[in-house]
A protein has these predicted regions:
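Pocket-flanking alpha-helical
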Residues: 61, 78-85, 223
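Extracytoplasmic/periplasmic substrate-recognition and gating elements
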Residues: 84-145
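Glycine-centered hinge/linker elements that transmit conformational signals in sensory
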Residues: 22-53
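Alpha-to-beta junction loops
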Residues: 65-74
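Short helix-initiation/N-cap motifs at beta->coil->alpha
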Residues: 50-65
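Beta->alpha turn/N-cap motifs
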Residues: 56, 73-80
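Extracytoplasmic/periplasmic solute-binding protein
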Residues: 1-25, 69
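C-terminal capping/gating helix-and-loop segments adjacent to ligand/active sites or protein-protein/ligand interfaces
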Residues: 102, 166-221
Length: 227
């Protein structure tokens, strides 16, 4: 459900800027964050606590192999984990508002204050990792979205002859052409903040939980976390 909060925040320019920056007191107290959390919380409560879990591994298994979960909020990866009997019935989709969440972290970076020799080696490594050769393997073997946009994903998918890989190519195309692409907020706000939001949403899934009161409690938790 934190992905829903993430996507709703990204649906406005102000909210997107907040998600792409460190969490601040202004963000915690903003209308954008309140709206995103409460909207997700109401959806969770309507869905019911019996359909809520923080065990992502089990949730993925229920979706990929058993077909007991209707929607999985996940990145464009793990196509190989989908059971062959379910591949034809699974379709990729973006969040409402044509929003895509980039689940990658900070990417590749070169440290400051290194010697020219080390800096040159580091840049060579980045050049290699982002090369078409390596990026094709990231798509076909790692089954993730390559950062090199020159890679022809559809051609690779067709060559593979694998339906799941073809669905992966479709998912990557949707993400790459989304109207709004935003970073996963746990990389900017921190995993501890993400966990606090998830816990609050799980509590809100219980029938009768006062969402407004739980949000006020969450605000206090987050302000304490960011000090």
């Amino acid at each position: 459900s934190s992905y829903i909060v993430n996507a709703i925040m990204a649906s406005t320019d102000a909210g997107k800027k907040m998600v792409e920056s460190e969490l601040t007191e202004d963000t915690v107290n903003s209308d954008e964050f309140a709206n995103a959390f409460k909207t997700a919380a109401k959806l969770d409560q309507a869905n019911g606590s019996e359909h809520t879990t923080d065990d992502n591994g089990n949730l993925m298994a229920e979706f990929n192999t058993n077909g007991n979960v209707g929607v999985l909020f996940n990145g464009v990866w793990n196509a190989s984990g989908i059971d062959a009997s379910l591949v034809d019935s699974i379709e990729p989709a973006l969040f409402p508002g044509n929003v895509a969440i980039a689940s990658a972290g900070g990417g590749l970076a070169v440290a400051n204050n290194m010697s020219e020799e080390k800096t040159e080696l580091a840049l060579e490594f980045i050049k290699y990792m982002t090369s078409k050769e390596v990026q094709e393997k990231i798509f076909t073997e790692v089954q993730a979205n390559p950062c090199n946009t020159t890679v022809d994903l559809n051609a690779l998918a067709e060559t593979s002859g694998d339906t799941a890989t073809q669905k992966l190519a479709e998912a990557c195309a949707q993400v790459n052409s989304a109207d709004t692409i935003v970073i996963d907020m746990k990389y900017t706000w921190g995993s501890d903040v993400d966990k606090a939001i998830v816990n609050a949403l799980m509590e809100c899934a219980v029938s009768g939980t006062d969402i407004d009161a739980r949000f006020e409690s969450l605000q206090k938790e987050l302000l304490a976390l960011i000090g």
